[in-house]
Amino acid sequence: KKDKLDLSMAAFILKNTLSDNGSVTRGICSVDGEHNVVEIEETYNIRREADGKVMAGEDDRKEVSEDSFVSMNMWGCPPEFFGVLETEFVKFLKKYGDMPKSEFLLPIVIDKLIKNGDADCKPLESHDKWFGVTYAEDKASVCEAIAKLIKDGVYPAKLWD
């Protein structure tokens, strides 16, 4: 299609985004031979087991590759994307608006656009460790990691004066 959206995403490596304190949800991305994202599967309850394997799901547990690309919701989108997002959000509200725990997930919208041929998406690989506080117990290690980045000069001590 001539009016396809050109998108990009920060593609983190799954093993660099796991929490030591519980399971996480990630958009696991499949990439084709031309380095295009062809699928984003929102995957729940991902955790590393005692045997070192990375597993996902509850009753229908499956092993997932710790080297998979995952979305951490850092996207590059043109301004036209926001009109598409608004249309999809209105559809979402009509279907799930009365369900308080429902979530409008960006990776699901982008996956639909890719599969319908309305968008191309390039993964921009990051091999850095993701620092996030999914659980209260994550806070200490995140603070330590950021302090180390500041000490090593990778990250500024102050963003603004």
PLM segments and residue spans:
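Conserved core of the sugar-phosphate nucleotidyltransferase
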Residues: 1-75
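Residue-level signal for inorganic ion chemistry
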Residues: 13, 78, 135
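Residue-level signal for well-ordered alpha-helical positions
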Residues: 21, 87-88, 145
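Glycine-rich loop/turn
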Residues: 56-63, 111-126
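Conserved nucleotide-sugar donor-binding
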Residues: 74-85
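Residues that recognize and position ribonucleotide moieties
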Residues: 74-75, 103, 132
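A C-terminal functional module that forms or caps the active site or interfaces directly
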Residues: 86-119
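Hydrophobic helical membrane-anchoring modules
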Residues: 115, 120, 128-161
